[in-house]
From Swiss-Prot:
GO annotation terms (biological process): methylation; secondary metabolite biosynthetic process
Protein name, UniProt field: O-methyltransferase aunE
EC identifiers of the protein: 2.1.1.-
PROSITE patterns in the cross-refs: SAM_OMT_II
Keyword S-adenosyl-L-methionine among UniProt keywords: yes
Pfam families: Methyltransf_2
Record function comment: O-methyltransferase; part of the gene cluster that mediates the biosynthesis of aurasperone B, a dimeric gamma-naphthopyrone. The first step in the biosynthesis of aurasperone B is the production of gamma-naphthopyrone precursor YWA1 by the non-reducing polyketide synthase albA, via condensation of one acetyl-CoA starter unit with 6 malonyl-CoA units.
TM annotation in the entry: none
Active-site annotation: 265
Family recorded in the similarity comment: Belongs to the class I-like SAM-binding methyltransferase superfamily. Cation-independent O-methyltransferase family.
PANTHER family per record: PUTATIVE (AFU_ORTHOLOGUE AFUA_4G14240)-RELATED, PUTATIVE (AFU_ORTHOLOGUE AFUA_4G14580)-RELATED
Amino acid sequence: APALGFVPIAVHFDLFGCLQEIGKPATAQDVCISITFLHKKSMFAKVNRSSDDTLFLMGGLGFLDLLPDDVYQANAVTRFLVDTPSAQHGAMHFTSEGLLASAFLMRRLMDTKFEYPFQECDTPFQYAHKLMGNEHLAREHVYSVMHETGRLDSFNTFMTGKFGRWGTMPDRVRKLGYDLDGLLQSTAPERIRVVDIGGGRGELLLEMQATYPHLLKKENLILQEYNADIGVVPEVTEMGWNYKEDASEQPVKGALLYSMAHVLHNLSDIESIKLLTKVARVMAPSSRLLIQEFTKNAASSTTHAAMILMHAGRERTSAEWRDLAAFAGLEITFEAYPPNGECVVEM
């Protein structure tokens, strides 16, 4: 675990990219020189002092190959990290915010006489900031903390890749037996509205638009995000909605499809029910709510732990989804749980 603390250094200085750019076995000095050419010369002195240890530890983690005489070489994992920037930023997130929360888990449990489960904004992540004297950050949500500490843009880059592992969203749900084609094609084009709640930079909507260009135009695709660093997504209709505010109701009524992908696992059961209830109140009889999260099993156990430690959230089983649906006045009409990747739950 201590070696994981060096991952943010490797990502910050682009050590993986520089090693791959060299294209042959290289010393830490070679990598540092490469950084001065690929980035800026002022970085050389900063990275030179820690590069050898960082490269060695990344080799120990399997992210690159360790060769004799303190020589390093890119391997398949290195190439994956370079070719998939979201993976590097994901690694940075889990070894920054995630590792911080993990380090303070037992301390918080002991200090609170093992109070569990955690509640939103009262997790080991906030407790870490409290004990470090950051009283303001200790009261903030992890996203607000990342915004204030300059980490949110990196996190958004990580989330850009959350849909890119096993094909596009339409391909993935088709393979699981969900009839997205039938749902869209059986509806008059002027009545089609797809609302992606917490949709980041709009990747899911853009994948749907690319698959159904004859059906989905900008006015059909509504991106709802409450995130200060998202920026403009010109191909979709952007709309702010802070569902956390008690008086803030879902502004789009009667949409054909409401989507939540990797949103509810960030929320406790109580907060999830609040959000689901707000959507349920505006759904028409023909409306569908489509949820995509990781299937809760051994493969997603690390993500499950991260959600608990930072968000008081969790991955969920079929029985847990059914309980949430019932509390929100909804009914599950389709569900599929692959052994790897994202499950699909329709309400």
